[in-house]
Amino acid sequence: MPAKMHSNYPSDSETAELRDSTESGYVSGGSSEEYLPEIVFTKPHLQFLNRQLQFLEPQDVLRWCVTSLPHLYQTTAFGLTGLVIMDMLSKLSIPRPQMVNLIFLDTLHHFPETLKLVDNVRKRYPLQHIHVYKPQGVETEEEFAKKHGERLWEKDDQLYDWIAKVEPAQRAYRELNVHAVLTGRRRSQGGKRGDLDIIEVDEAGLIKINPLANWTFDQVKQYVKENDIPYNELLDKGYKSVGDYHSTSPVKENEDERSGRWKGQAKTECGIHNPRSKYAQYLMDMERKRQEEALSQALQNKLTTA
């Protein structure tokens, strides 16, 4: 039976209901009809697509995505690979049934150079709309610290990732009705990305496409140089991969591209591309408990007034 993917990214409580019927990013035919997809993949179909797409140039992968996947967006922190994807999209010479807009997660802890780059990208690609999502209920780093505590990333990094990145991403997917996203992940970045497929389906049913999965860091840099693409000034100061200022360091020439992220820690991903975090599981459990208590109270009230 074909595997079904949600047409909307579910909320935390909704994901809890779907979790038991989900395996390796696929939702069984018994899951809620509320999330009937516009696209249906079987597992063999997804495997077939990856075998075919891995031999295509990134521009051809993007061309396939734009013409085949509805509600397609690009998620980016404006790293080099994301900038290359953006430039390639702007140059596709095909009738485009949809614009591929950007989703940028402003954690409120980016380097000033990163925010300057966002402005430069807007000027260079004026037709490209950037949807900016911030941690819920705050607009500045000071407000974030006041609400969640100083240096939260040191006290509870999973909670920080959830508040600053994962929840805003999931909120963006729901509000924008995202079905598929382009990411800047590549195999040469190492870590968990070493065996990356071109196209994936995450455990919530979101399609993720990694068009430059086969490219090296040098190939990405060369494209940026040849096409005069604006990039983060920190890359000229020893950085290769840039995230939040508190978890990003310069790297040596022989070090891996992402070795400057969370240096000295076993951590390699911020949570957006990981399975749902323990904190997310905690939130779902708390929501389930709240609903059970509300139901129990409602029944008690009904018995009292009967």
From Swiss-Prot:
SUPFAM superfamilies listed in its UniProt record: Adenine nucleotide alpha hydrolases-like (SSF52402)
State the protein's purpose.
The NADP dependent reduction of PAPS into sulfite involves thioredoxin which probably plays the role of a thiol carrier.
The ranges of region (Disordered) come to 1-30, 245-266
Q: Which GO terms describe its biological process?
A: cysteine biosynthetic process; hydrogen sulfide biosynthetic process; methionine biosynthetic process; sulfate assimilation; sulfate assimilation, phosphoadenylyl sulfate reduction by phosphoadenylyl-sulfate reductase (thioredoxin)
Enzyme class per UniProt = oxidoreductase
Pathway per its UniProt entry is: Sulfur metabolism; hydrogen sulfide biosynthesis; sulfite from sulfate: step 3/3
The EC number(s) attached to this protein equal 1.8.4.8
In terms of InterPro entries, this protein maps to: PAPS/APS_Rdtase (IPR004511), PAPS_reduct_dom (IPR002500), PAPS_reductase_CysH (IPR011800), Rossmann-like_a/b/a_fold (IPR014729)
Which Pfam families does UniProt cross-reference here? PAPS_reduct (PF01507)
Species of provenance: Emericella nidulans (strain FGSC A4 / ATCC 38163 / CBS 112.46 / NRRL 194 / M139)
Q: Which family does it belong to?
A: Belongs to the PAPS reductase family. CysH subfamily.
User: Which keywords does the record carry?
Assistant: Amino-acid biosynthesis, Cysteine biosynthesis, Methionine biosynthesis, NADP, Oxidoreductase
Enumerate the catalysed reactions.
[thioredoxin]-disulfide + sulfite + adenosine 3',5'-bisphosphate + 2 H(+) = [thioredoxin]-dithiol + 3'-phosphoadenylyl sulfate
Q: What is this protein called?
A: Phosphoadenosine phosphosulfate reductase
- What GO MF annotations does this protein's record show? phosphoadenylyl-sulfate reductase (thioredoxin) activity
